């Protein structure tokens, strides 16, 4: 039983015992007091997740019975169980005390009692300041009730303490604010929104289609009933939608010119009385009725000091200067000063100035400026519209005799179309007549669309207006990433999206959040883009009706009145959408950089002048909808040149090889600028470069991989220093590139031809058999195939760093330690069936392992290794310094570098006996033994004294590793020929067994599998030739 269940079970017993001991029950307040006296602590409401005592007892129907009291209170009585029935019966038989009985009133209670019975606690009134804050919060967007506390704290910097206002729960607060807040039930929960004006109009009971607000001038003439004068008034409907609505009081019969003067006067008095009634009733029920009359007079006094009008933005400042006190609209319950002025339309009049593009406030008692003055009509989002005369009719002519020559009709609206129309205004006398189309200020106060901008459209404060997305930071050369090809124009012009935790997964999370946000109809309507914001280069979002998702888009060009062409910065494609589907993008959705990266396939150019349709179609089929392995080559004019490889099949597919084999492309060793992106590059036009410290793809920098890359740089720097200091072991000097134009290392001829090996043709790709050496550039990047066993790929494996030379000195290059699928030298013992793990122990360079020193034996300058291969337990990296002979200079770019190789570890599954003395048996069983092997040859530094011909003499040798012993013995047995054979078999990819490579989806993109060993244009992979034949062309073709 959990702690919470134990507390609840104990609480049920305590409450039952308290209520059983009371014959007449307890109220919730009495229960709290009794519990505090008995236990010494308050009821554990918060611990159990309850907000009030009533919620607690209602959740215990088997313990507490809620009964209504005679005076309207709630009485809680206990429901006894089997063990407490006897106690309950005894308590029920108890007599009431004499004192209590005497205090009870005798006889029937008096009907005319002067005491009002208690009907329960009356909920307090929500203060105007709190109501204003709630309106301010919900004006931005609706808020779920579960998120209300967080939203309020984020908006105002404090929590919403409703208890200090006298409320017991949030439910009472919402009831008190029901005039401005409505609660809607959605799937996500209760949604709090601002109430619409239409609902208020219906609640007031006005006729359909008519909206009544305060008139411009109201005189207090006593209190009037809100019933009969209002309901007797009938108004005619507007004649036309184009004309301003004119309200004319319709009467059963119009008085004729020959009517009696007394009758006419009586009728006029009735009309005046009706007019006053209208003004009084509307003023009393509107928001302006809550403003203190003394404050109204002060505001009117300030405005009256400016006959030419006071700008609404200066009203608060002038009020403070005049009366030395601040005027806060929020403390009065208004959202802003505009809402306050709108509520005081009985004493203030508002006009819009075309010259200053601002609102002017006038005293309603003052006459306006004559027509043609600096003031003109108020357009959309303003408070009033120009005056218009009503048509002459018998009723207005009769009213003109009663000191009114003209009926000034003030038409005001919030929903008028955008027009720069200027119409003459009519003079408003001190006592205006009926309002033809009433001012809709009180109706609109609850709408968040109040705006004083001249643009006359409500723009959400968090909407993106003139902001651009950032691009992803450039990737380092030789970085290995997982990519999706999103949009293809040609092999020289396509877009990729990096697959990682901090790129693709963040994009998915953002799209899910955008769908949740914009799917709300209220939010979607609020973020509609007006016509004048739809301009090329504007960042916004759009929903695709086919898949119901929202995407970030950038407007590229406007196609017509209804359609625009947009660019998708996260996917790279361009599409056509409707203008009506565009929405403002919230600022929080601009933090994620644009995910689409413009790319060009490295080292290829079209066979003809342009890419053919068949070449593009074939490239699209290669990419498909699957993750690919990509290695960064370089950036040219901001375009990423990248190699692509598909590792999902049994054999790795290199896209540049396939395009060249099909005759669609020519492989070259240089990257040419993309012509397509040079003509049109949307990311360069519409996005900004990422900042220096903005590293988004942190998934490429997992602690393991980032540590690995950092140590790579340190090792390379230290290795370069060792080269300069002469500490390294016989480095090769770089040869000029002219010596490598033929790309044939004819000097390194071997004794046996690889073509004679029957397994050579089997393992060699068919499409690469007939390729000529001249057609394949030197050092083409390749991805080594790896046999996958039954072990589980460990995502936390990380490459280790190489050490060479003396203890603690770094190795400049790391040997390819993946021996999977290659021929192995083994003894007659079985391969160890155990898991190997990476070790961070420092490995010392063994001078006896020098593969290119062995190669010198071919040319006669034999350089014999000085001892066996030393090994260390629980290490998985082989430290090798590859050094060609100085007699055969090579290009330094063909030497493998540290970051070209990734190390994999595969368990051995099958046992095979190998003969130590017969190399032929080694070759025979090599294919079978290559399926499962150790992924690396651990190297341990030996002192010069320990260099002997047997592996047992090595202090770092393994005790129970037959594979390592056999390899060491074979190397020590035949240092010249056997070591060369071993090296050639290790480095020869023709003797691999290509099996399917599985890439776990959750694995970091920098570790995309055991076969993730690619060379790049700056770090070319160079396979050293074997001694199996005199021709190297077939071997190099197999590598390619």
Curated annotation (Swiss-Prot):
GO terms for cellular component: chromatoid body; pi-body; synapse. The modification Phosphoserine is found at residues 809, 943. Residues 958-975 have a biased composition (Basic and acidic residues). SMART domains: TUDOR. It is found in: Cytoplasm. It comes from the Eukaryota. Disruption phenotype: Male sterility because of spermiogenic arrest at the round spermatid stage, with occasional failure in meiotic prophase. Effects are due to demethylation and subsequent derepression of transposable elements: germ cells fail to repress LINE-1 (L1) retrotransposons with DNA-demethylated promoters. Defects in chromatoid body (CB) and pi-body assembly are also observed. Interestingly, Tdrd5-deficient round spermatids injected into oocytes contribute to fertile offspring, showing that acquisition of a functional haploid genome may be uncoupled from Tdrd5 function. Residues 533-592 form the Tudor domain. Its main location: cytoplasm. GO terms for biological process: P granule organization; spermatid development; transposable element silencing by piRNA-mediated DNA methylation. SUPFAM superfamilies: Tudor/PWWP/MBT. Residues 872-891, 912-924, 946-956 have a biased composition (Polar residues). Belongs to the TDRD5 family. Required during spermiogenesis to participate in the repression transposable elements and prevent their mobilization, which is essential for the germline integrity. Probably acts via the piRNA metabolic process, which mediates the repression of transposable elements during meiosis by forming complexes composed of piRNAs and Piwi proteins and govern the methylation and subsequent repression of transposons. Required for chromatoid body (CB) assembly. This is Tudor domain-containing protein 5.
């Amino acid at each position: 039983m959990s702690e919470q269940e134990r507390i609840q079970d104990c609480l049920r017993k305590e409450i039952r015992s308290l209520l059983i001991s009371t014959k007449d029950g307890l109220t919730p307040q009495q229960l709290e007091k009794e519990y505090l006296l008995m236990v010494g602590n308050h009821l554990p409401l918060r611990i159990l997740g309850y907000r009030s005592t009533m919620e607690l007892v209602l959740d215990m129907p088997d313990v507490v019975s809620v009964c209504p009291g005679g005076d309207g209170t709630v009485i809680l009585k206990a429901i006894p169980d089997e063990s407490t029935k006897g106690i309950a019966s005894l308590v029920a038989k108890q007599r009431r005390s004499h004192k209590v009985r005497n205090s009870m009133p005798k006889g029937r209670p008096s009907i005319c009692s002067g005491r009002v019975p208690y009907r329960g606690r009356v909920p307090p009134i929500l203060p105007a300041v709190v109501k204003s804050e709630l309106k301010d919060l919900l004006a931005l967007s609706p808020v779920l009730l579960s998120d209300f506390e967080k939203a309020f704290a984020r908006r105002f910097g404090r929590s919403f303490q409703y208890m200090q206002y006298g409320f017991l729960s949030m439910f009472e607060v919402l009831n008190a604010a029901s005039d401005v807040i409505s609660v809607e039930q959605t799937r996500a929960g209760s949604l709090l929104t601002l109430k619409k004006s239409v609902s208020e109009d219906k609640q007031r009971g006005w006729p359909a289609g008519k909206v009544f607000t305060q008139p411009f001038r109201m005189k207090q003439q006593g209190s009037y009933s809100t019933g009969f004068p209002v309901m007797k008034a009938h108004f005619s409907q507007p004649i036309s939608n184009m004309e301003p609505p004119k309200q004319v009081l319709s009467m059963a019969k119009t008085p004729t010119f020959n009517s009696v003067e007394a009758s006419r006067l009586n009728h006029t008095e009735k009309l005046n009385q009706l007019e006053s009634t209208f003004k009084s009733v509307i003023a009393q029920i509107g928001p302006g009725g809550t403003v203190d009359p003394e404050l109204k007079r002060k505001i009117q006094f300030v405005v009256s000091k400016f006959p030419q009008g006071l700008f609404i933005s200066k009203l608060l400042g002038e009020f403070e200067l005049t009366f030395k006190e601040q005027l806060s609209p929020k403390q009065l319950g208004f959202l802003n000063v505009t809402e306050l002025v709108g509520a005081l339309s009985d004493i203030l009049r508002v006009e819009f100035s075309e010259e200053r593009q601002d609102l002017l406030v006038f005293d309603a008692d003052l006459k306006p400026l004559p027509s043609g003055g600096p003031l003109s009509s108020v357009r959309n989002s303003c408070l009033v519209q120009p005056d218009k005369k009503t048509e002459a009719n018998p009723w207005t002519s009769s009213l003109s005799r009663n000191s009114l020559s003209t009926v000034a009709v003030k038409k005001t609206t919030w929903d008028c179309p955008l027009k720069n129309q200027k119409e003459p205004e009519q003079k408003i006398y001190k006592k205006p007549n009926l309002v033809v189309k009433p001012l809709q200020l009180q109706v609109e106060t609850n709408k968040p669309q109040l705006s004083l901008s001249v643009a006359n459209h409500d723009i959400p404060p968090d909407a993106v207006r003139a902001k651009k997305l950032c691009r992803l930071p450039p990737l380092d050369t030789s970085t290995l990433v997982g990519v999706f090809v999103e949009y293809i124009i040609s092999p020289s012009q396509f877009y990729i999206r990096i697959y990682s935790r901090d790129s693709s997964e963040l994009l998915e999370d953002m799209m899910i959040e955008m769908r949740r946000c914009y799917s709300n109809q209220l939010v979607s309507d609020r973020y509609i883009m007006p016509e004048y914001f739809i301009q090329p280069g504007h960042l916004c979002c759009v929903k695709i009706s086919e898949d119901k998702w929202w995407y970030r888009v950038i407007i590229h060009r406007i196609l017509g009145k209804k359609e625009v062409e947009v660019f998708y910065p996260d996917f790279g494609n361009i599409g056509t959408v409707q203008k009506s589907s565009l929405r403002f993008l919230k600022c929080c959705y601009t933090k994620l950089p644009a995910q689409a990266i413009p790319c060009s396939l490295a080292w290829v150019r079209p066979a003809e002048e342009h890419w053919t349709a068949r070449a593009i179609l074939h490239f699209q089929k290669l990419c498909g909808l699957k993750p690919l392995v990509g290695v960064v080559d370089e950036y040219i004019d901001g375009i990423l040149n990248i190699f692509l490889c598909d590792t999902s099949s049994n054999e790795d597919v290199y896209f540049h090889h396939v395009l060249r084999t099909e005759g669609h492309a020519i492989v070259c060793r240089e990257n040419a600028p993309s012509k397509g992106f040079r003509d049109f590059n949307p990311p360069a036009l519409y996005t900004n470069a990422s900042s220096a410290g903005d590293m988004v793809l942190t998934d490429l920098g997992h602690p393991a991989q980032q540590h690995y890359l950092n140590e790579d740089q340190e090792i390379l720097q230290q290795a370069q220093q060792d080269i300069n200091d002469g500490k390294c072991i016989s480095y090769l000097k770089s040869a000029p590139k002219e010596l490598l134009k033929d790309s044939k290392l004819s000097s390194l001829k071997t004794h046996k031809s690889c073509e004679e090996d029957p397994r050579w043709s089997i393992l060699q790709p068919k499409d690469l058999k007939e390729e000529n050496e001249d057609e394949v550039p030197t050092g083409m990047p390749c991805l080594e195939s790896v046999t996958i066993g039954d072990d589980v790929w460990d995502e936390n494996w990380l490459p280790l760093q190489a050490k060479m030379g003396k203890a603690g000195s770094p190795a400049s290059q790391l040997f390819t330690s993946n021996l999977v699928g290659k021929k192995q030298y083994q003894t007659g013992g079985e391969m160890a069936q155990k898991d190997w793990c990476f070790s961070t122990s420092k490995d010392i360079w063994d001078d006896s392992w020098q593969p290119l020193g062995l190669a010198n034996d071919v040319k006669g300058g034999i350089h014999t290794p000085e001892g066996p291969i030393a090994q260390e337990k629980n290490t998985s990296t082989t430290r090798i310094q590859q050094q060609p002979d100085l007699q055969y200079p090579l290009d330094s770019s063909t030497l493998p570098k540290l970051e070209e190789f990734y190390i994999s570890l595969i368990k051995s599954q099958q046992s095979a006996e190998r003969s130590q003395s017969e190399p032929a048996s080694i070759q025979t069983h090599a294919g079978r033994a290559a399926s499962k092997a150790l992924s690396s040859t651990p190297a341990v530094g030996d002192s010069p004294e320990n260099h002997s011909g047997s592996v047992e003499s090595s202090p770092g040798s393994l005790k129970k590793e037959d594979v390592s012993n056999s390899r060491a013995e074979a190397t020590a047995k035949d240092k010249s020929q056997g070591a060369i054979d071993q090296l050639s078999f290790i480095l020869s990819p023709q003797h691999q067994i290509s099996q399917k490579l599985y890439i776990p989806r959750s694995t970091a993109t920098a570790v995309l599998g055991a076969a993730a060993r690619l060379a790049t244009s700056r770090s070319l992979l160079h396979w050293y030739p074997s001694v199996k034949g005199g021709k190297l062309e077939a071997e190099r073709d197999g590598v390619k």
